[in-house]
């Protein structure tokens, strides 16, 4: 296991470059984000080769094309040298990504964000909030299936799920 802090910058840069080379699966984004390099900035890194896991701590910023994640801690899990899960924790953690070139960025925040790269699903846990195309979802748990365009939300008593859906403008509807 490696433990790196700001005091060991040369080794940190080398390890980050190595991790970046392995962390670009095609399922990482719907746009051309998957073809972009992943850039990760943090104060500390713990890389556990046997556990196939890298944990970044301290003002973590993850960028890959339009994908942006900001959190206090981010754990990246690998299988066969490919990223399979990204777990962001914060108060809150933030996620933003442009899913289609003609749409606004999807924005999300929660105490915990789990991005399943293979399934293209995002789980938001704890004071979860998701905004896309003006539609707004709030709850204790939000599961967003990006591929299917499906949102499942749950909340605990006494809180309820809150949702605001924007109507389609007549100018947005294509006549056939």
Predicted feature residues:
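Mature-chain termini and adjacent capping regions
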Residues: 1-176
